[in-house]
Amino acid sequence: MRKIYTRYIFDIDYTLLCPNWTPGNEYLRQNLNLDKESLKKIYSYITEYEEKVSFLTPDGLVNYFNQKGIPMTKDILDGWLIKNQNMTMVYEGVRELLVALKGHNKQISVVSDWFKECQYKRLEKAGLLSYIDTFVFGDTALKPNKEAYEKALAYTPKEQCLFIGDNYQKDIEGPKAFGLDAVQVTDENRYYMYRKLRKEIWMN
């Protein structure tokens, strides 16, 4: 018997939206006077910081960058977040899936490990806000901490929720350890997976 879900929980980057880091990288290179190797380290430092805390703060991230020798300031971070608000490309099949979900009275949550200031605006510019019922951003809780998954439930029973994301640790292992069903999307299977989910919804 096919399982019926009432809430679908999505990661954002590489799941709903396809990020293009080039403009943001160029902004950082110019404002921080970084060479190519130092620029690459920015993202590994973000990952390191996320592993040390349960939620993001701008001051905390700025301080961590400075500890690592990156001359980040709050103003530069704010400018970077604004620059990245323009990453609004929606993956093929996403809109159709969200339309089908709402057409069948399903609840939709999004969970992201990045700042609300950036991610909410991206969803708005991409035209996806109206489909989403619950938002969990890195300012509130970070995956794979259980608080992130708990907030995404919005009191929906775990067995009625499906988590969908690209990162195996945060979007598959984390949700499953918390008691959620989860499916991984990749560049190879993303469109097929969204078609499959849409078909299952129509068959319920």
Regions from the PLM with identified roles:
Residues 1-8, 34, 72, 99-102, ...:
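Asp-based, Mg2+/Mn2+-dependent phosphohydrolase catalytic module
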Residues 20-23, 92, 96, 121, ...:
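Generic recognition of short, well-ordered alpha-helical segments
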Residues 34-37, 47-82:
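A metal-dependent, Asp-based hydrolase signature
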Residues 48-49, 84-85, 110, 158-159:
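Short, contiguous strand/loop micro-motifs
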